[in-house]
Amino acid sequence: MAHKKGQGSTQNNRDSAGRRLGVKKFGSEFVRAGNIIVRQRGTKMHPGNNVGMGKDHTLYALIDGVVKFEHKDRNRKKVSVVSQNFGE
């Protein structure tokens, strides 16, 4: 049996930190313009009304309003922001 670890096992003990992806604002939650709604890799969810998409596929609100999750079609989800007119 070896009494030293060997070079391979000591070099392999690293792990990268999690990327903090996922939904940041949930359905019927109030958001302001510019708030991030979803961080994702690829288009798991697509932008709907009043939602923009960044170059890393992050979805964010374009207006102040309430988040609404809905189905775009059978297997695609869509995120929209519905404006709230407070007695105007």
From Swiss-Prot:
InterPro entries: Ribosomal_bL27, Ribosomal_bL27_CS. One of its GO terms (molecular function) is structural constituent of ribosome. GO terms for biological process: translation. Pfam families: Ribosomal_L27. Belongs to the bacterial ribosomal protein bL27 family. NCBIfam families: L27. This is Large ribosomal subunit protein bL27. The gene is rpmA.
